[in-house]
Amino acid sequence: MPFFTHLNQNSDITDITWNNRSRFAPIDKFSENIMRGPSELSIETRELIAAYVSALNECSFCTGAHLAVANQFSVSSNLLDELLENIDNSSLDPVFNPLFHFAYKLTTNPSRMVQGDVDAILAAKWSAQTVEDLICIVSAFNFFNRLLDGHGIKGNEKVYQMAGEQLSQKGYKVPFFIKLIKPLIDRQKKKYFDE
């Protein structure tokens, strides 16, 4: 169970970010930009990176939710397991290997990053902008993992599926008038979980 009384077993990140817009509105815009904005990285690749980083951090909510989003874009759940087992032996096209090695190192040992880590991505014919996109995704999900785990939000299969459906269809945009429609969204969420 979450650590705060305003949260419950079906809570997700929006139950944190939508309750404090002055703090979290910029993060929502950043999320939309890095996960759905222009990039050499496809949406499914970005979602797989998010799930991978989250799995490395053992954040059950973010792993489950972003794997569910990746599944909506036809990414197999087995692929995440393969990447966690051995990036180079996974069924992913090898051109992606340097990206996942970089994500692994930036997540597990960030102070050890060196020029060679960037050069490996560039040698695989990815652009410098893609490296920056990757840095933003990895950094953001390290933050989100700690935000969710710090609040005690673990999620469950139904929460992950709802997140997968919502994020694959609507992305990460949050309307400026969210405070006005949040009660309606909360009722819809309750109905979804009561079914």
Feature names for model-found ranges:
Residues M1-E195:
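Hydrophobic alpha-helical segments
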